[in-house]
């Protein structure tokens, strides 16, 4: 229904524009001027950019719209060098709501405001957020269309003492359009130079009077985006095709942008003069979109992707009484297999013991049915053709065909003969509503105070699904498409703000109450249930003599003298087939009795009823903010804020600021402050199971709350920051330069994947985690490491009459450097490198906007410094610096109508390429084994040049 509506509106808009005979102008702003008025940075009266004691950038809606993209995140990145946004081509929910980084910190370290009011965060948690954003849960900025905006104010300074949690890196305030008349309509069509990624957008804005004393301004944007692919065929998939498998997709795995369908967003902003200096206001939004992206390919002829890893990397150094290698729990590999039920690919292809294991489910009599074909029915391995790939493949094909032909055996080739690549789908719905009244009190002890009383509610829901996959544990009974559950984030806020001017001093104080709830809705049963093909602890197992045995194959008598078992899988090493056979012969237990298939929709397991629930936290805050013009040249300010949270307790923070006017054209400014970021309810309570790469192999890892692992409750991050800078107006040239330093302690992030310790297994069991001993890899949120981030921001603008018209130049430069000052015990060296080097240290933009009579042009050059590029969270390289150019040319047909053509990255600058398949991109690993062409963490994206046409009608 939404698709039909979209195209109908698109056609109507095109007709309106084509039929118009009215005159238009297309104004383009080069950047903020020092005289623009902003409300962020102080809780007192609004100030100009020049008078502000902290750095604030002001971006007009025209400047954002000239950036080419209709994605607000990309528009902001082009205008703000200290803001970085990564494409997430193969990821979890981060591909649906992309995180952005201001000043090198995580996306939830920047506070988002709309009309000066706190914006609710998204429900999505970026479990695979590209290093800096791992585990972040920030607001969904992409739902805000630039056509709904009057301007964007970017405070590049810590402001927790004024606004509360999250304002560590800074604050971005989106000011909605408040026009009471006129409007605009825009239709835009574009695609990448490679011929994919077609994007269709229609956007409109309408200003209306609300009686003769108010306004109602409404905006909408509707968008559809086709996917992109920057992929090669995976070598293993190509080998299958070369061997005659006609069911393999080309490419089997896609690296590129996801499909975005029916991306619809509506915003409204209204105000009504009540008389006596009072005004009522309301604003809000409704937004929804469908996202469909790809996951990793599952090869049908090996076990990668339908299992998790286990056993012990040090097993080769320990043996039992029989001389067989055992793990730390005293188990042989076979004993671990039968006890765990979910284990790994024991010998990977390309190793010394080259071969392929195939996981087989016994549906009843499987071993006897194909005994003549297969020596070990559960784990099929051949070494006879190690040096004869064709011979090896022939044996494997024969085994596969025998298993498929047997009614008593099952392998996943039967359902997916060409393998499968799961599709991660989601529906994101976002709503908000804010209402309030402001004015000036005229009676009582607060007479003369301006007041602002408001309440707001915001809700973000992400409904997840996984298509074209399996629940491996269900064997032949598995369906292929799953509804895996939902995340819901609900925020309620109440504010009372007071402000009064006392001669040269502005005094502000306020109260805030918030309630946030993170809710997990369970997925359908098939997405999380344990099927019959997984027997973790079979109660009816017997040995060859008919005597009952435990999960490790021991009788009750044998178990009394056996080692104390403690399943602590801690590695990804090989388990030898001869050990499996020796154990099987010694116990007379057929290994086919224990089928270690993974549980749940594979790739992103559904949320089980055990992990579902609603988790609520409340907090209140009191603040005071004072600014005083001590002399004509010196402005000083101080703010303090106290907050109390129902979860972790209270916190108090302060901020000191100054602005000193050295001359009429030169001013110094500076600030020092403390801040904090409270852990989100999602980070504190979420349970999630998904597939990730570990050393190039797919494995399932589970994210668990830290308190269920015995690691204690999450605590807030704490920060200390200071900044100082210079503001200059030299004729028509305006320059600001600022240095900043931010130290964050006890940063909240996801740990690296690791096997659970014995203590963690005990804690998980006590906390009610089912089958805790079977979890091969886990991670959790923790306060683990400290960072120090410093940098410099320089912004310069110049306007003049040049080239027969008016010309605006702007330059913005950012240097940011982050160091991990305390690594902690759970943060890997690889993650440290990503935290420190995955974002360019230097970024710059140079913009020129030219306006003639009826024609305007916009050109922006973007510079990206060297950075550490990473592929599949597996390996990385030092990427070269790069320059991209964006441009737009606009012709005014009439006073009201214009057409534009433009492009982003018009010279088609490539991202850093992964070495060719014949080369090595990591020690011992061939290149492009996953089919990627570019390192996907490129700050400029991997899709190349994008070209578009746009028609606009203003009225």
Name each model-derived stretch:
Residues 607, 611-619, 665, 675-738, ...:
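Outer-membrane beta-barrel signature, preferentially recognizing the C-terminal barrel domain
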Residues 194-418, 422-441, 892:
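Transmembrane beta-barrel wall of Gram-negative outer-membrane proteins
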Residues 72-75, 79, 100, 113, ...:
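N-terminal periplasmic accessory domains that precede
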Residues 46, 77-122:
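Extracytoplasmic beta-strand/coil segments of soluble accessory domains associated
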Residues 119, 134-186, 229:
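A beta-strand signature from Gram-negative outer-membrane beta-barrel systems
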Residues 122, 744-746, 863-869, 890-955:
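C-terminal beta-signal and adjacent terminal beta-strands/loops
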Residues 740-872, 950:
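Gram-negative outer-membrane beta-barrel transporters
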Residues 36-67, 94, 123-134, 183:
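N-terminal periplasmic "start-of-domain" segments of outer-membrane beta-barrel proteins
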């Amino acid at each position: 229904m939404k698709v039909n509506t979209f195209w109908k509106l698109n056609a109507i808009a095109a007709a309106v524009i084509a039929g118009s005979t009215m005159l238009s102008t297309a104004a383009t702003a080069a950047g903020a001027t020092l005289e623009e008025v902003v409300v962020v940075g102080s809780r007192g009266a609004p100030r100009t950019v020049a008078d502000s004691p902290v750095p604030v950038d002001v971006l007009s809606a025209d400047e954002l719209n000239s950036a080419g993209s209709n994605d607000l995140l990309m528009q902001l990145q082009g205008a703000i060098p200290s803001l970085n946004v990564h494409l997430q081509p193969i990821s979890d929910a981060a591909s649906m709501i992309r995180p952005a980084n201001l000043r090198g910190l995580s996306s939830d370290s920047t506070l988002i405001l709309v009309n000066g009011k706190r914006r609710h965060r998204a429900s999505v948690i970026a479990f695979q957020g590209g290093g800096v954003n791992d585990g972040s849960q920030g607001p969904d900025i992409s739902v805000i269309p630039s056509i709904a905006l009057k301007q964007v104010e970017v405070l590049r300074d810590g402001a927790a003492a004024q606004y509360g949690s999250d304002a560590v890196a800074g604050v971005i305030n989106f000011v909605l359009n408040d026009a009471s008349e006129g409007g605009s309509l825009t239709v835009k069509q574009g695609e990448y130079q490679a011929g994919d990624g077609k994007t269709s957008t229609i956007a409109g804005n309408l200003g209306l009077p609300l009686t003769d004393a108010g306004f109602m301004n409404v905006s909408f944007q509707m968008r559809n985006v086709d996917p992109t692919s920057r992929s090669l065929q995976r070598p293993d998939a190509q080998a299958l095709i070369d061997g005659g498998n006609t069911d393999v997709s080309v490419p089997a795995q896609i690296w590129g942008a996801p499909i975005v369908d029916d991306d619809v967003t509506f915003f409204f902003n209204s105000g009504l003069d009540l008389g006596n200096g009072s005004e009522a206001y309301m604003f809000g939004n409704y937004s929804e979109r469908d996202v469909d992206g790809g996951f990793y390919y599952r090869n049908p002829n090996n076990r990668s992707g339908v299992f998790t890893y286990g056993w012990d990397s040090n097993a080769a150094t320990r043996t039992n009484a029989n001389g067989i290698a055992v793990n730390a729990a005293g188990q042989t590999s076979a004993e671990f297999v039968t006890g765990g039920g979910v284990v790994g690919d024991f010998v990977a292809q390309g190793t010394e013991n080259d071969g392929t294991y195939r996981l087989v489910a016994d549906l009843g009599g499987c071993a006897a049915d194909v005994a003549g074909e297969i020596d070990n029915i559960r784990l099929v391995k051949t070494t006879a053709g190690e040096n004869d790939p064709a011979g090896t493949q022939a044996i494997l094909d024969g085994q596969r065909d025998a298993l498929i032909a047997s009614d008593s055996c099952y392998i996943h080739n039967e359902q997916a003969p060409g393998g499968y690549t799961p599709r991660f789908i989601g529906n994101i719905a976002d709503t908000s509503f804010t209402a309030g009244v402001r004015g000036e009190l005229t009676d009582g002890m607060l007479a003369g105070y301006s007041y602002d009383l408001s309440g707001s509610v915001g809700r973000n829901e992400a409904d997840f699904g996984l298509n074209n996959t399996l629940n491996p544990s269900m064997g032949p009974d598995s369906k292929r498409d799953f509804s895996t559950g939902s995340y819901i984030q609900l925020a309620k806020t109440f504010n009372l703000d007071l402000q009064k001017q006392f001669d040269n001093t502005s005094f502000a104080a306020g109260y805030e109450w918030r309630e946030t709830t993170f809710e997990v809705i369970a997925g359908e049963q098939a997405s999380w249930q344990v099927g019959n093909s997984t027997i973790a602890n079979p109660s009816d197992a017997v040995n060859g003599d008919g005597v009952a045995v435990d999960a490790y194959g021991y009788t009750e008598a044998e178990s009394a003298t056996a080692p104390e078992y403690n399943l602590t899988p801690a590695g990804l090493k090989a388990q030898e087939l001869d050990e499996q056979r020796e154990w099987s012969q010694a116990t007379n237990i057929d290994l086919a009795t224990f089928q270690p298939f993974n549980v749940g929709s594979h790739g992103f397991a559904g949320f089980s009823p055990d992990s579902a629930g609603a988790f609520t936290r409340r907090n209140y805050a009191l603040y005071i903010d004072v600014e005083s013009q001590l002399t004509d040249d010196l402005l000083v300010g101080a703010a303090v804020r106290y907050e109390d949270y129902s979860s972790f307790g209270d916190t108090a923070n302060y901020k000191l600021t100054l602005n000193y006017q050295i001359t009429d054209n030169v001013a110094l400014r500076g600030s020092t402050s403390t801040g904090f970021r409270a852990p989100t309810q999602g980070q504190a309570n979420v349970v999630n199971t998904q597939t990730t790469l570990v050393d190039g192999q797919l494995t399932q890892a589970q994210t668990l709350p830290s308190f269920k692992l015995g690691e204690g409750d999450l605590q807030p991050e704490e920060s200390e920051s200071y900044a100082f800078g210079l503001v200059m107006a030299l004729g028509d040239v305006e320059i600001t330069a600022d240095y900043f330093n931010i130290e964050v302690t006890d940063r909240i992030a996801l740990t690296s994947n690791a096997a659970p310790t014995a203590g963690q297994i005990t804690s998980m069991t006590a906390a009610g985690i089912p089958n805790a001993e079977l979890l091969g890899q886990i991670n959790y949120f923790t306060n683990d490491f400290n960072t120090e981030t410093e940098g410099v921001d320089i912004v310069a603008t110049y306007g003049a009459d040049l080239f027969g018209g008016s010309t605006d130049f702007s330059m913005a430069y950012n240097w940011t450097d982050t160091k991990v000052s305390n690594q902690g015990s759970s943060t890997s060296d690889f993650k440290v490198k990503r935290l420190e080097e995955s974002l360019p240290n230097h970024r710059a933009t140079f913009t020129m906007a030219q306006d003639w009579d009826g024609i305007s042009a916009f050109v922006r050059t973007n510079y990206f410094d060297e950075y550490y590029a990473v592929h599949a969270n597996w390996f990385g390289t030092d990427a070269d610096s790069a320059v991209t150019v964006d441009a737009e040319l606009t012709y005014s047909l009439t006073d009201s109508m214009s057409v534009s053509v433009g492009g982003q990255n018009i010279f088609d600058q490539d991202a850093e390429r992964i070495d060719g398949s014949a080369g090595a991109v990591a020690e011992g690993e061939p290149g492009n084994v996953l089919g990627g062409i570019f390192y996907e963490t490129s700050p400029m994206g991997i899709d190349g040049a994008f070209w578009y046409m746009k028609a606009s009608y203003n009225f």
